[in-house]
Design a protein with these regions (language model features):
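C-terminal transmembrane-helix exit sites in multi-pass transporters
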Residues: 78, 99-119, 129, 209, ...
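Hydrophobic alpha-helical transmembrane segments in multi-pass integral membrane proteins
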Residues: 42-53, 101-116, 173-187, 236-251, ...
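Hydrophobic/aromatic residues within transmembrane alpha-helices
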Residues: 21, 30, 81, 107-113, ...
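Transmembrane alpha-helical core positions of polytopic small-molecule transporters
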Residues: 11-12, 67-75, 97, 172-176, ...
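Membrane-interface interhelical linkers
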Residues: 1-10, 17-29, 33-64, 75-84, ...
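Alpha-helical transmembrane segments of compact multi-pass small-molecule transporters, enriched
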Residues: 36-42, 93-107, 201-205, 240-241, ...
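Structural signature of hydrophobic alpha-helical transmembrane segments
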Residues: 1-11, 55-71, 113-126, 190-204, ...
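Hydrophobic transmembrane alpha-helices of multi-pass small-molecule transport proteins
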Residues: 42, 103-106, 116-135, 143-151, ...
Length: 300
């Protein structure tokens, strides 16, 4: 449970800082730079902890490469959804990945959840949907870009709400499948190398297709502040992934995934503490339900 909470904090921080960077840079640039920073962090962590570099079997490497590719598509889908839809609603939809990973873990890994565990997972998912899908806030693309990055972003993008929801649902399924694969192979091959392989695959794949993407020259005009936000997003994401992997190694994938999926609460907390925002009754009810779910998961 502890590592699931750490993962939630890390991914919540990453989501917040990436959203700031998205105001000034294109989504694929944010993903590539932040993921590259994350890989460097994970490699340094692996070397520093003397993680066995050859502990991952060939079949596991193939599965983790797929996990990395699925994760990359999920990141791109989510960031595009946030760019054209309500960030809160998109985060709420995407965060249901915990339920997807939990179902896969029960069906494919044979994990067993007690009645309290099942109730905790259900409450956590319901609570985060209520908490994150509160009053809509302007999407990053809806606000006029500021700073040197404004020249990079180009025209404000617009999109169908249905498209945004579809992309968020796609990211939820992708995150769930990727989270399940990462959890399964963290149990088999240690908690660091699977993340290095999956993250590394994402970076190499995106770097390979970058020349084919529209706006591939989006690096021009990026200021240090934007690069800094992207770096923080990458470090927080990698730290969250390491915590998630460790949690699934020593505990259950289903429970760790469900707990980590409460990450959208972190941006809400930043808004309340730093910006003086007020939570709606729906959001407060969602947070109470999340806490109840965490208590049940702790008792499971």
């Amino acid at each position: 449970m502890f590592y699931g909470l750490l993962a939630a904090i890390g991914w919540g921080t990453s989501t917040t800082t990436a959203a700031i960077a998205l105001r000034r840079a294109r989504s694929h640039i944010v993903v590539l730079f932040s993921q590259a920073i994350g890989v460097v962090f994970l490699v340094i962590l692996a070397v520093g902890t003397h993680a066995p570099l050859l502990s991952v079997a060939g079949s596991a490497v193939v599965a983790l490469v797929w996990a990395g590719l699925i994760g990359l598509l999920s990141y791109l889908a989510f960031y595009q959804a946030v760019a054209i839809g309500s960030p809160g609603l998109m985060s709420a939809i995407s965060s249901t990945y915990g339920g997807v990973a939990a179902i896969l873990a029960v069906v494919l890994l044979g994990e067993r959840l007690t009645g309290l565990g099942i109730a905790g997972v259900v409450l956590a998912v319901i609570g985060i949907v209520l908490a994150a899908a509160g009053p809509g806030t302007p999407a990053p693309a809806a606000a006029a870009p500021t700073g040197p990055g404004a020249a990079v972003s180009g025209r404000v993008r617009s999109g169908s709400p249905a498209l945004a929801v579809s992309l968020a649902l796609l990211s939820a399924v992708g995150y769930g499948v990727g989270g399940y694969l990462l959890g399964e192979y963290s149990q088999r091959s240690g908690w660091l190398m699977p993340g290095v392989i999956a993250h590394g695959t994402s970076v190499l794949a995106l770097a390979g297709v970058l020349p084919l993407l529209r706006g591939r020259n989006g690096w021009r005009g990026l200021d240090l502040a934007t690069l800094g936000w992207m770096a923080v997003a990458g470090l927080a994401d990698a730290a969250a992934l390491a915590a998630y992997s460790r949690g699934t190694q020593i505990g259950q994938v289903a429970i760790t995934a469900a707990i980590s999926s409460i990450y959208p609460v972190i941006p809400l907390a930043f808004g309340v503490l730093l910006l003086g925002e007020r939570l709606s009754r729906r959001q407060l009810a969602g947070i109470v339900i999340i806490i109840a779910g965490l208590v049940l998961l702790g008792m499971a």
